[in-house]
């Protein structure tokens, strides 16, 4: 299988070594999340040895995906700290439109970006990155439905299945999930190998 990929700033010399990887990934959830965009990367990351903590507005609440698949929240977003995680996973669906209004979601997303930790977002998840104002001058992709929003927020929008610009990893739709999850796992493996080198 061949993929069209835009890669920027991912050479070994450009990578920053992050202190003490926790082997933990934070994922956001709320009602009407895109089922596959949460579960596919979550399962892949767990297969590779990462613990994925799914945080929603309320701990213990069971959130329903667009297709009805349930996801209980392991934690409350407002209690999460960037320092406790290696990366941020933001699935799409319509949940990001609600989550972007939560100051804790915006602050956490900015904190991951400021600490140069991977932020993997797909489909409508770009809405959260827009509200966090982390896309200005950066290459990224999304579902075509929010292309104008992304561009108006200063992103250099690229119509490709995977776009990596430094710590930002983005894909368009569920059809791009294989390459999306593979890229996030590869980035985390690189970070892990740099830490142990």
Stretch-by-stretch model annotation:
Residues 3-115, 119, 128-137, 147-197:
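Extended, subdomain-level signal for the structured scaffold at the beginning of enzyme domains
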Residues 122-124:
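Short, thiol/selenol-centered motifs that function as redox-active sites or metal-ligating centers
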Residues 140:
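Anionic-ligand binding patches
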Residues 143:
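Active-site-adjacent substrate-recognition loops and nearby beta-strands
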């Amino acid at each position: 299988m061949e993929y069209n990929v835009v890669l920027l700033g991912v050479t070994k010399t450009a990578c920053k070594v992050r202190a003490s990887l926790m082997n933990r990934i934070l994922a956001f959830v709320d009602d009407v999340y895109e089922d596959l965009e949460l579960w596919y990367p979550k399962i892949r990351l767990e297969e590779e040895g990462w613990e994925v903590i799914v945080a929603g507005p309320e701990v213990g609440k069971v959130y329903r995906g667009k297709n009805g698949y349930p996801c209980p929240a392991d934690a409350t977003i407002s209690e999460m700290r960037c320092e406790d995680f290696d990366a941020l996973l933001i699935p799409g669906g319509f949940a990001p439109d609600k989550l972007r209004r939560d100051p804790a979601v915006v602050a956490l997303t900015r904190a991951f970006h400021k600490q140069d930790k991977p932020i993997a977002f797909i489909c409508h998840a770009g809405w959260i990155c827009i509200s966090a104002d982390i896309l200005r001058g950066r290459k990224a992709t999304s579902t075509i439905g929010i292309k104008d929003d992304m561009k108006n927020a200063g992103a250099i929008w690229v119509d490709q299945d995977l776009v990596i610009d430094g710590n930002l990893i983005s894909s368009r739709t569920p059809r791009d999930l294989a390459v999306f999850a593979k890229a996030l796992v590869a980035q985390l493996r690189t970070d892990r190998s740099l830490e142990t080198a």
